[in-house]
Amino acid sequence: MVTGIALVTVERKMLRQATDALLKIQGVTEVYTVAGEYDLVVMIRVTSNSELSDVVANKMTHDIPGIIHTRTMISLQADAKVDLCQFYDSSKHSEPKVFA
């Protein structure tokens, strides 16, 4: 599994629409609204670097109105309390979950 962390700047009036659109992209597992230099942190979990590139370069920046800028990092190692590959198995989590 390849994990990308995208820091995203969004037009303020488009924040909710951008968040909803991002959650519909295959491979996007979480979207966090944050304070600071960026507006959103987007977690992307895919099977290859080329798939990550497609999500960031095409689906995020070209297909979603309101996104001004992205900066993407690739995780070199993940340490977690759960098996992330099993947790994010697409067959088990096909629809985005919203937690209040």
What feature does the model see in each segment?
Residues M1-A100:
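A compositional/biophysical signature of low hydrophobicity enriched in polar/charged and small residues
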